[in-house]
Amino acid sequence: MPQSAARGSAAWALVITGAASFMAALDNLVVTTALPSIREDLGGALEDLEWTVNAYTLTFAVLLMFGAALGDRFGRRRLFLTGLTIFTGASAAAALSPGIDALIAARAVQGVGAAIMMPLALTLLTAAVPAERRGAALGIFGAITGLAVASGPLVGGSLTEHFSWDWIFWLNVPIGLALLPLARLRLKESHGPGARLDVPGTVLISAGLFGIVYALVNANADGWTSATVLLGLFAGTALLVAFVFHGLRRPDAMLPMRLFASRAFTGINAASLLMFLGMFGSIFLLSQFLQGVLGYSPTEAGVRMLPWTAMPLLVSPIAGVVSDRIGGRPVVATGLALQAIGLGWFALVIEPGVAYSAQLPALIISGIGMGMYFAPAASLVMSSVRPAEQGIASGANNALREVGGALGVAILGAVFAAQGGYESGDAFVDGTVPALWIGSGAVALAALTALLIPGRRARGTAPAGEGAKEAKEYEPAAA
């Protein structure tokens, strides 16, 4: 292929995959600043609002690696188009939802589409870009995804205020319809290794996580000792235990448990899950606090959250450079500690009528902490496994982040419902403060977990005993 044609193909691949990933990443948090308007328009209790977030994150998380495997087997472009079609159609269905149950169902289908689309977008881009320009392309791709996450609350707030909440979903439809013919024409079909599809593993983890999250979300409404809640907790836990044994026995499992033999891999993934648990649950409540208690408009609420959500765009590149010099472990641990301090600061200062100036330090500290986490955490994940396993490791980490987010909304929502409610500003604060302390504690535990990640061995040294030869060829996770 001529050089100019190759450049054009790579540019088109970046535009198409970047736009698709922007939509999928945006929909993680775009709904948060629209929640008060959705509640006012469609009704629904706290648990219904939690499901508008969790229906997306759960299906996204549990099907992420399965979607990548489908693409490898049946064609990456073909499945990318399938995921994009599902996501676009579900976005239209969400916008047209006549009630809260229909919206939750549409959000779940959105998550299915995103889970197929997202991993294949990265694979298609990598294949389309020449090796000498791949780093720059992947950097732009990562920046686009980060911008989508950061701008989610602002975009959601602005569309809700100036149009209505359904426009946060209508936004995806013209973009998706434009991308479908472009992807068909401009992306090349490719296949991966013909690995077996782990359908049993996907069913086990999907049902297990659904049972636990369902129980947590409905515990306060139904009672912690109700049959449905107890069944959800026990059945969900049993299914997740079965998923672990399945991963131990099947070498081609969706999430091979052999990866967790690496203390570095286990540590960074545990820290990631806890970090997203605290962050997602806190954003879920604080975005409603800014509007429902302090009286900010949706746009004003989104703007006021930018010091937190947008700070990683500035801090992450610097954190990446620093981690290359001193190792990822201290940078990640420091970032998580700052995030925990920021959430604790929120818990100390929020009250009905609290000034924004009192909240601003917490927002900035949390944003800096989040930015210090992202780039070094990705590096720690990749360096904790062998090169041949990096694709699986990255997918597992992304899935566990989404699981953490879903659990965070469920757990912090349960604490909020037990201690407060929507009856008044005081009631909302009564529920939010203990929930924020739980979120802060989860992120603090993540910081301690990050400190336990093993340090880097001196280059060329190997552990004694079996596998020493292999260790010489592979350097474990950075300090």
Where are these regions (language model features)?
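Conserved aromatic/hydrophobic "specificity hotspots" at molecular recognition or selectivity sites
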Residues: 165-204, 248-251
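Phenylalanine-glycine-rich, low-complexity intrinsically disordered regions
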Residues: 187-193, 206-229, 244-248
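Glycine-rich, flexible loop/turn motifs
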Residues: 25, 60, 112-114, 145, ...
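Interfacial helix-loop-helix linkers and transmembrane-helix boundary segments
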Residues: 71-78, 134-136, 191-199, 253-256, ...
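Intrinsic disorder in cytosolic terminal tails and internal cytosolic loops
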Residues: 1-9, 453-479
